């Protein structure tokens, strides 16, 4: 497997030789994990195009893949696979998404069992450009703060809620607030469209800490008055998109991008709605749902 850092980018690497289909031994899996922990975003190229079943199996090597919980927008036979597209055929929307800008977020932050790794594969891309996916390093935001600022942020909790425009397609029994706590072992991977998490997350593999917020799904800091919450969140979220912390991925058909969901936020650039953009996505979650939230003093 060949891993090449993306020239001039603060994060991200291109990977050739990853085994996306077929068997994968423990050593090869650990090589991918190591590259992911180092570069946060991996662009896999030059591999055999996986079937839907193989795509799902590849994602499962990195943790449990929950169902999307969508009544429409997911693959009809594999609800775990989200179809992301701007297509409408015979008056029927294909998948979820559109050609507009999609704001900064990390997938499933509104669930008590949050995402660990994202997998997004390009099936069709706009031929005249646009539709890039942007990734911002939120570990770098935490590490840029003073010790006093870090200690303060460790004391806060944040409410996340699903606010993406397709809430009505979520199965009704999942539309509720669920928070880790007593009886956490009974929480199902797909539970919840609203939850409360600590503001600071910790990667259980590397120990790095990130500021776990987004513009799309973060409602407020529950420990602050609304105006104070908004002021602090706006200040922190101004980090998203800064060039020194952000990689903009221009898609090629067949690209499979794998990224650290705990330590980054991502967004989508707008593109010409007359052109086609079709992707498929799965997300792995942490086996230990409390893993990212172990209480620790700020470094």
UniProtKB/Swiss-Prot annotation:
Which top-rank group of organisms is this from?
A: Bacteria
**Binding-site residues, Fe cation:** 105, 107, 266
Q: Name one Pfam family in it.
A: TauD
This one is known as Pentalenolactone F synthase
Q: So what does this one do?
A: Catalyzes the Fe(2+) and alpha-ketoglutarate-dependent oxidation of pentalenolactone D to pentalenolactone F in the biosynthesis of pentalenolactone antibiotic. Also able to catalyze the oxidation of pentalenolactone D to pentalenolactone E.
Q: Which UniProt keywords apply?
A: Antibiotic biosynthesis, Dioxygenase, Iron, Metal-binding, Oxidoreductase, Vitamin C
- Please spell out the taxonomic lineage of the organism that makes this protein: Bacteria, Bacillati, Actinomycetota, Actinomycetes, Kitasatosporales
Regulation acting on activity, per entry = Activated by ascorbate.
């Amino acid at each position: 497997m060949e891993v090449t850092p993306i020239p001039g980018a603060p994060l991200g690497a291109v990977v050739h030789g990853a085994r996306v289909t077929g068997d994968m031994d423990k050593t090869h899996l650990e090589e991918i994990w190591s590259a992911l922990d180092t570069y946060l975003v991996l662009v896999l190229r030059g591999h055999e195009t996986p079937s839907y079943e193989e795509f799902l199996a590849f994602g499962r090597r990195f943790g449990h893949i929950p169902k999307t919980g969508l009544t429409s927008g997911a693959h009809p036979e594999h609800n775990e696979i989200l179809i992301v597209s701007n297509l409408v055929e015979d008056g029927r929307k294909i998948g979820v998404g559109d050609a507009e800008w999609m704001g900064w977020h990390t997938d499933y932050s509104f669930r008590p069992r949050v995402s660990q790794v994202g997998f997004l594969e390009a099936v069709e891309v706009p031929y005249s450009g646009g539709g890039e996916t942007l990734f911002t390093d939120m570990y770098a935001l935490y590490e840029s703060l003073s010790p006093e600022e870090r200690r303060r942020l460790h004391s806060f909790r944040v409410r996340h809620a699903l606010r993406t425009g397709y809430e009505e397609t979520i199965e009704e029994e999942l539309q509720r607030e669920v928070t880790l706590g007593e009886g956490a072992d009974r929480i199902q991977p797909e539970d919840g469209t609203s939850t409360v998490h600590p503001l600071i997350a910790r990667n259980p593999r590397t120990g790095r800490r990130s500021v776990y917020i987004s513009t799309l799904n973060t409602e407020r800091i529950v420990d602050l008055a609304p105006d104070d919450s908004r002021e602090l969140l706006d200040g922190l979220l101004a980090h998203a998109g800064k060039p020194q912390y952000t990689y903009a991925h221009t898609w090629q058909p067949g690209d499979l991008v794998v990224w650290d969901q705990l330590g980054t936020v991502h967004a989508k650039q707008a593109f010409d709605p007359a052109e086609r953009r079709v992707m498929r996505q799965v997300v792995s979650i942490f086996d230990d749902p409390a893993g990212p939230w172990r209480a620790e003093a700020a470094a």
